[in-house]
Amino acid sequence: MFKGSMPALVTPFRNGELDLETLKKLVEWHIGEGSNGLVPVGTTGESPTLTHKEHEVVVEEVVKAAAGRVPVIAGAGSNNTLEAIRLVRHAEAVGADAALVVTPYYNKPTQSGLIAHFTALHDCADLPIIIYNIPGRSVVDMSPETMGKLAELPRIIGVKDATGDLARVCDQRSTCGPDFMQLSGEDATAHGFNAQGGVGCISVTANVAPKLLSQMQAACLAGDYATALSIQDRLMPLHKAIFIEPGLVGVKYAMSQLDLCSEEVRLPLTALSDETRALVDAGLRHAGLMN
């Protein structure tokens, strides 16, 4: 159910407020362009700077707009287990297909703490849970052994892996089993991740190039890595440019260049520098997305 290219959706703003009309248009556009799923209110969706109510509204609107045509994986992570439970239960109540739960950031739990946290989330609802392991942001790295223990729980179904370590795919397959779903969380290494046994990517760049990334993921799933590599080469300058500064800022600027949404972000994030804008523009042209 959760395979292929799934954009980590941006949250559009206009004059400091949620721009829900643009959000709905983006959902339609992504489905039309071939995206295989939608992932609202993750890092790229600026979840840290949304209010609790805004977080819930975005999930609700994406679920309603998708209307069952593609799965919706709702961001539901927190370093407060009780808050994460509330988010998982809300995602289930409004009809999301799964919850994406980041490892608790800032308070640095042990591996035992990670097991307790994710077990509590597993037990609080009937919603499938995808672990989000991103040690560069959370400052805690879930080990393959810990992941293997959590994979024994029936509703812990997979991982979004943003470690950048392609050897992890094999290690996690060994500890979690071949049916445990592994999704890349890094656009620049997604091709190699799939070659190691991954089945898709929760992608930032897919916000601006959904058709190309859907085609790349489809080629990987069909075993046609040569075609997938040609698409990845076409997109690599854009991947790299988007992440020179925070990726959601880069991709919102790229989207604004294609009139998809405003580049507006919330503090403490700020607009791209002129130098980075020029590199994103060059990446868009290299990908054939802009003249």
From Swiss-Prot:
The gene is dapA. Pyruvate binds at T44, I202. It catalyses: L-aspartate 4-semialdehyde + pyruvate = (2S,4S)-4-hydroxy-2,3,4,5-tetrahydrodipicolinate + H2O + H(+). This is 4-hydroxy-tetrahydrodipicolinate synthase. GO terms for cellular component: cytosol. PANTHER family: 4-HYDROXY-2-OXOGLUTARATE ALDOLASE, MITOCHONDRIAL, DIHYDRODIPICOLINATE SYNTHASE. One of its GO terms (biological process) is lysine biosynthetic process via diaminopimelate. CDD domains: DHDPS. Homotetramer; dimer of dimers. Its main location: cytoplasm. Keywords: Amino-acid biosynthesis, Cytoplasm, Diaminopimelate biosynthesis, Lyase, Lysine biosynthesis, Schiff base. Coiled coil: none annotated.
